[in-house]
Amino acid sequence: MPSEMILRLLDEMARYKLNRFHWHLVDGGGWRFPSEKYPLLTKKAAYRMEKDWDTFWQKDRKFVDEQTPGAYGGYYTKDEIRRVISHATKLGITVIPEIELPGHSNELFFAYPELSCKGKWTFDASDVCIGKESTFRFFEDILDEVIQLFPSKYIHIGGDEAAMNHWGSCTDCQRRMKEEGLKDNHELQSYMIKRIERYLLSKGRKLLGWDEILMGGLAPEATVMSWRGEEGGITAARAGHDVIMTPGSHVYLDFYQRESEGEPRANGGFTTLEKVYSYNPEPTALTPEEHKHILGAQANLWTEYVLDARHAEYMLFPRLLALSEVVWSPQATRSYSDFLARVNYHVPRLQERGINVYPLRRIAVDMQLDSTRREVSIHLSSERQPSEIRYTTDGTEPTATSQLYLGKPIVSADSILLVARLFDGAKPLDLPSVRYRTDYHKAIGKKVTYNGHTWNEKYPAGGTQALVDGLRGTPTYLDGKWQGFTTPLDVMIDLGEVTELKHVFARFMQERMQWVYMPGDVEVLLSEDGETFRSVGKQVTRTSEEEYKPVFETFSFPMKERARYIRLKAANARSAGHFIFTDEIVVW
């Protein structure tokens, strides 16, 4: 992001009492910190030809020289860094720099390949060689330059997502492990973190790292930034270490803030204003004494998919206002409805100051099932206040004469396509409508048996009934409605009695950059007794594994059959560790 944008951001941070700016200066997408001792970092690893992140990451991950015509990228000058620090200091904000190690170092090897295990740049190399002393000399030199510029007592060293895929075959790393008595790769990484910590302590600074630095043994005086949930932070606090909470589930602002249709590209997740506001940075699992180690919470905006400063502002505001209230107000005194009224007052003021703020345009759809009446009740609400919501149930776009939502649930026993839109009197707001398909189909509420494997524990959705609860997923797998699997899916639905069947279908998604792929094929089988099954069709996915943009595919099986048991099988398309996601098995 341009330094001018950072200066504007600092002004808004001060206005809303946010007092730490964590500056992620280097990563696999480019080196942005100016080094006098290692000038090739900015000459050879700060520019690339592909602006689009997916194209760059999937294509070749190669960089070009600084003066290459048409190249995308750049780096900060020392004067720009000094200006940012000076401005932040005047506003009472501390700037914390981050230099990534040992992972996220793809760009580093394009300038200094000798720091890799193989001694050359390769497509899959992202971790520095811990066995070479030259690696430590390099980072000590870089940290010296960082310390000269940044007065922060904390220096962030990353420590996250090391692939560890070359250390096992690297003679230097294996020699290091033998000499130091290290039993695995996690201890090898911990050796590096602890050694870097000793160096920082000798310079009067403290080490800060992502929660992976817990693995293999935590450095004695390290502070942990917990991003993979709260577990790492809880573990560190119980061990007497200071912690900053920043879980991806609640405070990753590179995620979509509403359903993705009509929104600029984001990083696949789903973090609404309400979700940010709901976060409690003090886990109930900790004692009052352990709570003292929770220094605060941090929101993160990763910019792989953020194209410019205006886009960055759109992702940050007004969700940063929710974070401010989270960290400054006791949870017992917080009220989302009260906050929503106030944040609607602040949005136009942010706009007056030139901030490209997200205009609070989400219509939330909450669906409840009545199994006795076999009906679906739909409740609508909006972030925007005051506002009018008009809707249709036949899939047509709402107009000024369409039904006005007055808070009473919309009830239906049929299959409907709800379309809702915000209005100002007779005028529709220049915001996209929301579409939501719902129906009370024959499998809703029926018994489901998972054969062999169940869902991945991180993505349970509604558990055993998730695939027959009538809840369709939104365009993000993190909305709590998509059930995720790292094993083949094999489920059986018991309809309770032999039933006439006309149609069975299930929808899957692909989000390649999040390791979510289509199943290789989907098969539907039927049975009267639950023992002997007959196949009524198998479909192979039409989606290429190479498609990296989000894709949704419905596997549809029309039929004229009678059966009590329906079995749906979906085969994984990729190797272990990759996901398939589905939201509902619909039966008519």
Annotate the PLM regions:
Residues M1-N19, V419-A420, S433-K442, G452, ...:
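Mature N-terminal, pre-catalytic/accessory segment of carbohydrate-active enzymes
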Residues M1-P2, G28-P34, P102-L108, H156, ...:
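Flexible loop/turn segments at secondary-structure boundaries
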Residues M1-R205:
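Substrate-binding cleft of carbohydrate-active enzyme catalytic domains
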Residues F21-W23, I155, A297, V504, ...:
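Hydrophobic residues within beta-strands of alpha/beta enzymes
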Residues L207-E212, G217-A222, R228-S377:
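Flexible, acidic glycine-rich loops studded with aromatic residues
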Residues P330, R334, L340-D490, M509:
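Short, compositionally stereotyped local motifs that mark structural "simplifiers"
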Residues E397-Q403, E531-K538:
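Surface-exposed loop/edge segments in extracytoplasmic proteins
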Residues G473-G537, K549-W588:
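Aromatic, loop-rich ligand-recognition surfaces of beta-strand-rich domains
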